[in-house]
């Protein structure tokens, strides 16, 4: 199969809120952030086999721009970053590609039509060079390539007992369906996770732990074969992208996708409210990020031995509360790692789930910069299998979903955002607002997305939570 890599130069400015890594963002009183997008693309082709091995290596070309900060990201899912704004509190935001080049997506989709690779990022790759510059909003794309940026805000560390329930239908699986970017049909079981220490099996996308409780069993290096997925203790299997339950695989030749094999970093998803703890401290110098367990001598090993558990709870500051009748697939990007938008928070109609808020003060940093979480928000009624994947132009799903959430916490303050996806200007088929969870919670600012419009203007909106919790309310 073939996949293309795009070398992107993006020069930032303009106002927007989102969840991107790689850059520092200063919070303004109005909770706005700045970004601008100017694109320049260079295309190359890499051929890989069904296991993700590169058959024809491609030399990375990097487009440069006359600015002070240049970041190179190579041979992974399309990555772009940019953000800058004035304010009293300095925040860095977590990186994710908010757009995928139409040609890359279509080529990847056709090239993998006969494979079981659910995420087109398993068969498509890009290299982005990002530069920061302060000026007015500019958004231009060449070759119909909307690889773009969104800037998301950040985090804090507050924890209290969760009163929200998981899912009123937690024993009911999100519908089994055939993903639009894969030819294989797979199901996501939502029944209670079997064993918290199981080394195989998919379990539930809702996980085996009560909200903000556990984990209790430490991961043992060198005991689980690389071909067994270590579900349990908060780890959940991603069954619909054809990678053996892993949320992404980064291979020794810098290709991505395929099975977890010798020398690969095998990334995984954690249940809603949690984040993975595994990534090597020694990150690639070319700007890529790497995360997950290391497959060594046929067995799985932690890449971050400072963490005993594979998943950790974020800041208990945000819940998604649905007033809808249909389920909503909210898909977090897998970062550090491939940035596949496959990590699910699937909220059934009438139920609620915690939204993972990254504690930026302790979580992964990219070149010394803090990172936060970014989510792609699908229309109501889109299954998790169809929504939490790399989409294609016009599909309205995955990285082409109409809306993004940003979530992070730093210095005791949580920042939550509603962000437009530059890939898709269509309105969601429901509304969203961020409000205080109760009278004891303090949420500063207004953030509402209604009938496709944001209360903060075209660039989205952000609130800060200084105490208690906030709700992302989904309503008609």
From Swiss-Prot:
Protein name: Probable secreted beta-glucosidase SIM1
Cell compartment(s), UniProt: Secreted, Cell wall
Signal peptide: 1-19
Similarity comment text for this entry: Belongs to the SUN family.
Lineage of origin: Eukaryota, Fungi, Dikarya, Ascomycota, Saccharomycotina
Coiled-coil parts of chain: none
Glycosylation sites: 423
Annotated Gene Ontology cellular component terms: cell surface; endoplasmic reticulum; extracellular region; fungal-type cell wall
Additional notes on this entry: Present with 1800 molecules/cell in log phase SD medium.
Knockout consequences: Leads to increased resistance to zymolyase treatment.
Pfam family, one: SUN
Induction field: Expression is repressed by anoxia. Expression is decreased during transition to slow growing or stationary phases.
InterPro entries in alphabetical order: Beta-Glucosidase_SUN, SUN
Stated role: Involved in the remodeling of the cell wall during the various phases of yeast culture development and under various environmental conditions. Required for the maintenance of the CLB5 kinase activity.
Keywords attached to this entry: Carbohydrate metabolism, Cell wall, Cell wall biogenesis/degradation, Glycoprotein, Glycosidase, Hydrolase, Polysaccharide degradation, Secreted, Signal
Residue spans of biased composition, Low complexity class: 111-203
E.C. number(s) listed in UniProt: 3.2.1.-
GO biological process per UniProt: fungal-type cell wall organization; polysaccharide catabolic process
Residue span of region Disordered: 111-214
Xref: PANTHER family: BETA-GLUCOSIDASE-LIKE PROTEIN NCA3, MITOCHONDRIAL-RELATED, SECRETED BETA-GLUCOSIDASE SIM1-RELATED
GO function terms (MF aspect): hydrolase activity, acting on glycosyl bonds
């Amino acid at each position: 199969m073939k996949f293309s890599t795009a070398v992107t130069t993006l020069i930032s400015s303009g106002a927007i809120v989102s969840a991107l890594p790689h850059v520092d963002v200063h919070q303004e009183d109005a909770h706005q952030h700045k970004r601008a997008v100017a694109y320049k693309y260079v295309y190359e082709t890499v051929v890989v086999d069904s296991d993700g091995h590169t058959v024809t290596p491609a030399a990375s070309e990097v487009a440069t721009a006359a600015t002070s900060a240049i970041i190179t990201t190579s041979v992974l899912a399309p990555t772009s970053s940019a953000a800058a704004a004035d304010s009293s509190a300095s925040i860095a935001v977590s990186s994710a590609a908010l757009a995928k080049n139409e040609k890359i997506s279509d080529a990847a989709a056709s090239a993998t039509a006969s494979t079981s690779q659910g995420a087109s990022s398993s068969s498509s790759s890009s290299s982005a060079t990002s530069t920061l510059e302060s000026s007015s909003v500019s958004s231009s794309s060449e070759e119909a390539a909307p690889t773009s940026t969104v800037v998301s805000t950040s985090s804090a560390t507050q924890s209290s007992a969760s009163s929200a329930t998981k899912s009123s239908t937690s024993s009911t699986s999100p519908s089994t369906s055939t993903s639009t970017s894969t030819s294989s049909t797979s199901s996501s079981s939502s029944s209670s996770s079997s064993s918290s220490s199981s080394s195989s099996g998919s379990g539930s996308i809702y996980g085996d732990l009560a909200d903000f409780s556990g984990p209790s069993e430490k991961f043992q290096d060198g005991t689980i074969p690389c071909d067994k997925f270590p579900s349990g203790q908060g780890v959940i299997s991603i069954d619909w992208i054809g990678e053996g339950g892993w949320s992404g695989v980064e291979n020794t030749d810098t290709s991505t996708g395929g099975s977890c094999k010798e020398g690969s970093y095998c990334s995984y998803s954690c249940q809603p409210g949690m984040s993975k703890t595994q990534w090597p401290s020694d990150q690639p110098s070319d700007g890529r990020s790497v995360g997950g367990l290391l497959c060594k001598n046929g067995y799985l090993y932690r890449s971050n031995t400072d963490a005993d558990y594979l998943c950790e709870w974020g800041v208990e500051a945000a819940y998604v509360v649905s007033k809808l009748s249909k389920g909503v697939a909210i898909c977090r990007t897998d970062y550090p790692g491939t940035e596949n938008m496959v990590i699910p928070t699937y909220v059934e109609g009438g139920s609620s789930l915690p939204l993972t808020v990254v504690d930026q003060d302790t979580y992964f940093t990219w070149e010394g910069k803090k990172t936060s979480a970014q989510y792609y928000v699908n229309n109501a009624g889109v299954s998790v299998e169809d929504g939490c994947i790399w989409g294609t132009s016009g599909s309205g799903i995955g990285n082409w979903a109409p809306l993004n959430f940003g979530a992070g916490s730093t210095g005791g303050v949580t920042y939550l955002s509603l962000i437009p996806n530059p890939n898709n200007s269509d309105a969601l088929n429901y509304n969203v607002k961020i409000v205080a969870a109760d009278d004891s919670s303090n949420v500063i600012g207004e953030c509402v997305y209604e009938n496709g419009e944001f209360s903060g203007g075209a660039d989205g909106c952000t609130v800060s939570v200084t105490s208690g919790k906030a709700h992302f309310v989904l309503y008609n």
